[in-house]
Amino acid sequence: MNATPRIASLFDSLLEQKGSDLHMSVGYPPLGRIRGELVPLREAPLSVPEMESLLFELINPEQKRQITEDLDLDFAYGYGTKARFRANYFYKMTGLGAVFRTIPSKVLSLEDLKTPEVVRKLADRRSGLVLVTGPTGSGKSTTLAGMINYINHTRPAHVLTIEDPVEFVHESQKAQVTHREVGPHASSFATAIRSAGREDPNVILIGELRTNETMKLALQLASFGVLVFATVHTNSAPATIDRIINAFPAEEQGQVRGMLAESLAGIVAQQLLKTADGKGRVAALEILVGGSAIASMIREGKVFQIASKMQAGQGQGMQTLDMHLERLVKDNVVTPEAALEKAQDKENLAKVISRLKPDWEVPEALKSI
């Protein structure tokens, strides 16, 4: 469906300011997330009739039926040649609302994203489970798209993506890339993942591991010789491992530990921070690389030891989030305050920053940490 001038003006305003999200709520003006901050895109608040008119003009009759019956709708919207958006419609106390997340029209390469070499090595794997994790809006999809883009341009492989909705569209290069969307192409993630095993894939991207059923299916595929990429909403590598194991009943957790220990290739946990110059955002990455030592810790239930292993595993490309935050502060990419806001051990990082920058004073709000 074509955007009318009313909503097109909001999309254009967001894109001109390099915003990441458009928030629309009844009783408030449309808000854009610009460099991490929500700012009004116009002064006038949205009324109920205006909201429904603006949002319904973008969807087809089947989608209107879905939002009316399910009270929730996810879909991808192509705004001409300018951009794609991942849209979520939902109902709340004040009525219909929506969030549109910008999907860059160009798939950024790993070089564009300035990811460390170890991320490319994870994409070079021929099998195993690679998880990209972080909170909503931390750039997980962008990092995964960069890894798929790398595979697409470097080797002949069948790459299958299963998403809800499809975000980045990859045109086949050296690889054959097949996109499947939950809803139009499959009834559920689980159904699509089961079917994937019969579609001769070398690489599978699963938009999100939401249930223990999809987690187990992903682990099985990874152990069968497929390279599986997926996202999880967790803030660190150890928390990701715990999240997967704890998603299962106690009687199944031993088996899941074994499967995860065998198949885990790596975890990239990321956070987005505003840059020190205020002109953009940068990703801080925690990186875990699977291996015999990590596998033993997972099997033996010693996940609490993994952070220490990452600190000692720099030769393998491993790092904790705080290690990367320290480097970003040292290189003046981010401010000490921005780094401390995301740090896992705020007290320790504050001490490290004080040594790096003797003239820096810990803000009063942080002295009680």
Predicted regions, residues:
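Short, flexible helix-loop junctions that flank or precede catalytic/ligand sites
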Residues: 1-369
